[in-house]
Amino acid sequence: MNRQIRAVSLLAGLMFLALMVNLTGSAMFRQASLNNDPHNVRVRDAEFSQNRGNILVGSRPIATTTSSNGKFAYQRVYLSGPKYAPITGYYSYYYGRSMLEQTQNAQLTGTSDAQWLSRITGTLSGHKPEGGSITTTINAKAQDAAWDGLKGKKGAVVALDYTTGAVLAMASSPSYDPNELASHHLNDTTRAWKNLVADPSSPLSNRATREIYPPGSTFKLVTAAAALQNGYHPNSMVDSPENWILPGTRTPLTNETNCGGSRITLAHALDISCNTAFGKVGVSLGQDKIRDQAERFGFGKVVNSDVSSVASRFPQNLTDAQLAQSSIGQFDVA
């Protein structure tokens, strides 16, 4: 009997120890992820009871917080909501967070590691914690132009500062109003969410970062760079037939314009965007060299972690016909 009691006691002790280890591990190592989990009701209630930081374009807030007499002390408000929705995302009590509202949540709630001093100061002074603001790289005029240009159309516009990679504009159409998801009223928010999800035009999808499209002739820059890295020169002569039957197929590759002869320089082929010339150059280089150059340009990588993004791609195991099409930004390049 004593042996059985000792065995049960040992088992109970081990189970208690395992529980303590799990709780300690959760507290020490999973604190950040638990605090940032939008499904954590305790943290979520605390967030909605404090003054969240602004998201700024220049000095102008595009997402801010106002006092509220509703369920919580503060209400999230979006200015020009649909125009900036692909950047700010939404901040919803019932449906979580997206885009900058998600990736910069720690800064916006004042819980980031860099804000430890302000938290201590606030505690000592008895003030409630407040979130910190974030300033985007968006240029207001560029964003206006992008948004206005997309009116009535389906698509996306992104403008970059090529010297730094800074995003100057990011617009997606059709869009949505994040104010509808920021409401504290469950019925209103649920109705808005269901309508957005059911909309066949997918307004919740950020076409600038979450959708991938064939790059088309812009990819010829990648093929040209691969050529220059592998023995070609700007004045190298390349074949540029008016029509070219793709290897192993009956499919012709044609040109949108007259390339200027059956053989032209690589520089001229790029200048006039000659399809057959770059298709042939791509096949002569081989898919490994084209793919390597594409990866140097960022293909296969998520290039912007501040908003939810998907990686671009250059396909594998290509036939020569597929490689020719890929070398001009078609086939499965996206």
Give the location of each predicted region.
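Beta-lactam-recognizing serine transpeptidase/beta-lactamase-like catalytic domain environment
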Residues: 168-217, 222-334
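Extracytoplasmic/periplasmic proteins that interact with beta-lactams or build/remodel peptidoglycan
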Residues: 1-156, 171-212
